[in-house]
Amino acid sequence: MPYTSNPAKIQRTPNTQNSGVNQPPVFEPITPIKVSERWFPKDRRFGLYECGGRVAPNVTSILGWKFPFDKAKWKKSEPNIDHDAVTRESAKRGTAVHLAMEKWLQSHGHAPVEEHLQWINPLQSLVSRASKTLAVEVPLHHSIHGVGAYAGSCDGVMLVNDDVVLIDYKTKRHGKEVLPKFCEQQRLQLAAYSLAISHLYKDQLPAPVTRTSLLFAHPEDGKPVTVVSTQGNLLLEYQQKWLDLLGEWYEVHGDQVAYEQNNFDEQLKLSTW
């Protein structure tokens, strides 16, 4: 029977020292593959990464094509807010929280601004329970035979007991709840990453990825992180959904990717003359 997931409310019982500061899990990182920085070709609605001479669209661009953001619907549902300001603040907060978690997991010194601690502290309390950190911001660039390639970067790969788990950080505004039925896009994103990481790093990981977890941090004091996990048969279903979507995307955009590949090859030739 397929595994079904409800948002698990994980109460915080942090792994701490006498200082009261959350201590990160043991850091035993895998060696990442070399992938270029992302760039956006002119007049394209997708970004590209390059690895080994091959270009590949980023996962978030593919998902953005499948799940276009409906700003008009958002404005109708929340008419009394400054939508542009909320968007800017959300992006700023997300960048700050991701950077803080990245530095913390690697035990690098970093002092986030105080206003973001209400999201950072609960995430650190939860993630500190993991057995090991295997990767932070791990790059991926993966080709599916007969379909096409895709690329991206995953927030973290953790060992939780004997399970290899992908994690992705999300931050919510005050008063916002999380429902798994509205996490389709994010679950597909991690399903794509799980397929790629299990293949690309199979010789370095203790096992294939068996679970993906979306970690939604809330700013309300004392409110636990909401975890939406996908595993077992449900993860297999989402992996297949991703492969189907990837095929659909390449049917529409495959010629454009081929054109950009040719451009890249030509530029590479010119640079080596």
Task: Place the predicted regions along the sequence by residue.
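Polar/charged alpha-helical tracts
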Residues: E28, R88, S107, Q118, ...
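Amphipathic alpha-helical interaction segments
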Residues: G47, Q106, P112, V127, ...
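Accessory terminal regions of nucleic-acid processing enzymes
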Residues: M1-P2, Q17, S143-G146, L205, ...
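General "foldedness" signal
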Residues: G109-E115, T226-V228, N263
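Mg2+/Mn2+-dependent nuclease catalytic core
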Residues: V138-H253
